[in-house]
């Protein structure tokens, strides 16, 4: 799995939404996950799993 670090939660939301709009599949809704972590998971059209996240 590839993890992409974003500078803020707004960009995490935007990237996750864009990935789904472009044909990706949701693998985990965007939101807080434990202390200091905000992220979401998706698979690209080729099936690769990615995470976009930021530290909060």
Describe each PLM feature range:
Residues 2-45:
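Vicinal oxygen chelate
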Residues 41, 52-56:
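Short beta->alpha transition motifs characteristic of CBS
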Residues 49:
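Glycine-rich acetyl-CoA-binding "A-motif" of GNAT/NAT acetyltransferases
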């Amino acid at each position: 799995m590839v993890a992409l670090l974003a500078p803020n939660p707004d960009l995490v939301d935007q990237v996750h939404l864009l990935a789904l709009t472009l044909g990706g599949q949701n693998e985990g809704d965007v939101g807080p996950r434990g202390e200091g972590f905000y992220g979401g998971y998706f698979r690209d059209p080729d099936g690769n799993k990615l995470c976009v996240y930021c530290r909060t």
